[in-house]
Swiss-Prot record:
GO terms for biological process: RNA processing. CDD domains: RNA_Cyclase_Class_II. Its main location: cytoplasm. It comes from Methanosarcina barkeri (strain Fusaro / DSM 804). The active site is at H301 (tele-amp-histidine intermediate). This is RNA 3'-terminal phosphate cyclase. InterPro entries: RNA3'-term_phos_cycl_insert, RNA3'_phos_cyclase_dom, RNA3'_phos_cyclase_dom_sf, RNA3'_term_phos_cyc, RNA3'_term_phos_cyc_type_1, RNA3'_term_phos_cycl-like_CS, RNA3'P_cycl/enolpyr_Trfase_a/b, RPTC_insert. The lineage of its organism: Archaea, Methanobacteriati, Methanobacteriota, Stenosarchaea group, Methanomicrobia. Belongs to the RNA 3'-terminal cyclase family. Type 1 subfamily.
Length: 331
């Protein structure tokens, strides 16, 4: 059984998600200790538990240590099965982070996998559902990944209530070298149970800030009724994105500007992928082989994901500084 120190590097939930996904792919049983050891509230939270439970269901794994606050788990997979699964994370637990825990394994499933997931689609400290759909999936398609998601309903913190359907087919991943895409910025600004002018103001503020920086954009707006109150905006171009969520007392103009200010440094750098996508791509690139990208900043999430991935797979990542950017490659 492979022993993984859960406090290594970034030491958060992502390390656990990547380790479990690659355990499923390789069939290697694992024991992860010191999970979220240095966090204010160490151990597993509800959304981590639901992700691990889902991964265990899909690959018929034996799993122990699955309880709130647990700092150690063991996970022994059998085989990755297909089929249909209904998952309710509860409240506003992140749907996108749950998917991160299982998506790297799904190309190796025996048959197609269909998921219906309830939870949070737009919550803090996780990719928005629009980011996953328009940035992450676009990048994964280049690596031969076969999957899609359909947003049924937005769900915001703290009530959640979002709903997503997802569909994945077994596939063979292929190598790809990511280059900067040249096109206009697109976006989606949305709000539920709020005045219709809220998403409009978010979009207008983002467009204005982007144009001041020299980047034209086309941002769609949506206003609707849903289970929870909230707003958000996501911007994307190629393999680069930026997003911001509304908060009580935060003007809509500030939300839009925050999203623009997140994507502008990424665009100015000339990197092929943004700093968030950079860490997400690591396990897929390792499974595909001979792939690369450039990124403006090497985050602790990325270096941690590289370390975890190299524990499971016979690959070696290389990091080189080139013209002010970091080139990350695997062979």
């Amino acid at each position: 059984m492979l022993e993984i120190d859960g406090s290594y590097g970034e030491g958060g939930g992502q390390l656990v998600r990547t380790a479990v996904a690659l355990s499923a792919v390789t069939g290697q049983g694992i024991r992860i200790t010191n999970i979220r050891k240095n966090r204010p509230s160490p151990g597993l939270k509800q959304q981590h538990l639901k992700a691990l439970e889902t991964a265990a269901r899909i690959c018929r794994a034996q799993i122990s240590g699955l309880f709130p606050g647990s700092t150690e788990i063991s996970f022994v997979p059998v085989e990755i099965e297909g089929g249909k699964y209904d998952i309710d994370i509860g409240t506003a637990g992140s749907i996108t982070l749950l998917l991160q825990c299982i998506m790297p394994a799904l190309p190796f499933a025996k048959e197609k996998v269909e998921l219906t997931i309830k939870g949070g689609t737009d919550v803090a400290w996780s990719p928005t559902i629009d980011y996953l759909q328009h940035v992450t999936f676009r990048a994964l398609e280049q690596l031969g990944y076969s999957g899609s998601i359909t947003l049924k309903e937005h769900g915001y913190y703290p009530k959640g209530g979002g709903k997503v359907s997802a569909y994945f087919k077994p596939c063979r991943l292929r190598e790809f070298h990511f280059l900067k895409e040249k096109e206009d910025i697109k976006g989606s600004s949305h709000a539920s149970n709020l005045p219709a002018h809220v998403p409009l103001r978010q979009a207008e503020a983002a467009s204005k800030r982007l144009m001041e920086a020299g980047y034209p954009s086309l941002i769609e707006t949506q206003s609707f009724e849903a289970f929870s109150i909230g707003s958000g905006i996501t911007l994307w171009i190629g393999y680069i994105g930026g997003s911001a969520l509304g908060e009580r007392g935060l003007p809509a103009e500030k939300v839009g500007k925050n999203a623009a200010d997140e994507i502008i440094p990424e665009l100015r750098s000339g990197a092929s992928v943004d700093t968030h996508l950079a860490d997400q791509l690591i396990p897929y690139m390792a499974l595909a082989g001979n792939s690369s990208y450039t990124v403006r900043e090497l985050s602790l999430h990325t270096t941690t994901n590289i370390w975890v991935t190299e524990q499971f797979l016979d690959v070696k990542f290389r990091i080189e500084k080139k013209e002010g950017l970091f080139e990350v490659s695997v062979s």
